[in-house]
Amino acid sequence: MIDLKLLQKDFQTISNKLSRKGVDADLLENLKIRNEELKVAKVAYETLQAAQNSMSKDFGIYKKEGRDTTELKAKVDENKIKIAEALDTQRIKQEALEYLAMSIPNIPDDDVPDGKDENDNVEIKKVLTPKEFSFTPKEHWELAGQNGWIDFERGVKLATSRFSVSFGMGAKLERALINFMLNFNSKRGFEEVSVPSLVNRAALEGTGQLPKFEDDLYKIQGQELFLIPTAEVPVTNLYQDEILHVERLPIKMTAYTSCFRKEAGAAGRDTRGMIRQHQFHKVELVSITKPQQSDEIFDEMVQTASDLLSALELPHRLVRLCGGDLGFGAAKTVDLEVWLPGQNAYREISSVSNTREFQARRAKIRFKDGDKNSFVHTLNGSSLAVGRTLVAIMENFQNEDGSITIPKVLSPYLN
């Protein structure tokens, strides 16, 4: 959640920054109005409470002096009713403000490029040169079918479209990639954790998926439980509503989970293959840091994901996202896009974001430094999306006969 005090202090500046994310000015103006209404409600309550305190003192004096308290008692009783009404009004105004504020995205950093969508993102650099093939490279779904690694039709039979089943070497490679990624991240100082695949509403509100993106989530009927869209949600919320001692920071974690997304806004996009699935495997990085550490940790997380791709000999590039393409909770993001020769294009395989204190405010994650409690910064990023890594291996390591060479670093994981 954005800092409402910051918005009050300089509404126009914050409004201008949020407009770079495409936030409607009317929404921000409405937030300002709700905030003013809450301030008025608080003043009304405090005024009535002050009057009550004054009358209570008078009541004691009246009784001590033996004076008639009938009229004063009637005023006290009447004021109690007004206080209860004022407190209820204040609660309603507070809830209205907080609900609206939960729908406002994070403020982008000043150095985030201007732009409306992915076409305005800025390439930082390319890493490794794509291989030149002496034949026309095939796309991954053709290779997966030819080698018997992945069956999309059986995925549909078991569930619906955008599900798949892995067999034989395809399944073994997925398992090998998960272990390789976790080991790689652990060696970079990220502690491995294992978390639930179901979370409650508070966890999703903490990391920013709710209330805005509920249509993209799978919910358990009759319960306030949701399948996780990313490990970012449970891992970040491990420290929800806690005050951490400064010596514990930074906390750096890595986790493997299955992820579940309805992809409600992806109709017609990547309808074939494994690029966009309702269920997929991912290894995540999450860091919880002091504010002054977060930029350094951000660069470290980007480098970890890039080095992992390089270890797998997969050509990729780093891209800085523009304001219009930034995620809801991100203050800044660098995407890593892997080269897919079958598609003759770079495709996203990792997204590393610094949310600053945005998620920490929502999830109430703070740290104590001396006598002061402050909000931490939280960061997250894929390292890596397992299915898309498998896609990249199939396309980049394919041979003319359709067979696929396995990257050397995975050999120990495949006996």
From Swiss-Prot:
It catalyses: tRNA(Ser) + L-serine + ATP = L-seryl-tRNA(Ser) + AMP + diphosphate + H(+); tRNA(Sec) + L-serine + ATP = L-seryl-tRNA(Sec) + AMP + diphosphate + H(+). It is found in: Cytoplasm. The keyword Ribonucleoprotein does not apply. L-serine binds at residues 230-232, 284, 382. Transmembrane segments: none annotated. Pathway: Aminoacyl-tRNA biosynthesis; selenocysteinyl-tRNA(Sec) biosynthesis; L-seryl-tRNA(Sec) from L-serine and tRNA(Sec): step 1/1. GO terms for cellular component: cytoplasm. Catalyzes the attachment of serine to tRNA(Ser). Is also able to aminoacylate tRNA(Sec) with serine, to form the misacylated tRNA L-seryl-tRNA(Sec), which will be further converted into selenocysteinyl-tRNA(Sec). Homodimer. The tRNA molecule binds across the dimer. This is Serine--tRNA ligase. It comes from Sulfurimonas denitrificans (strain ATCC 33889 / DSM 1251) (Thiomicrospira denitrificans (strain ATCC 33889 / DSM 1251)). The lineage of its organism: Bacteria, Pseudomonadati, Campylobacterota, Epsilonproteobacteria, Campylobacterales.
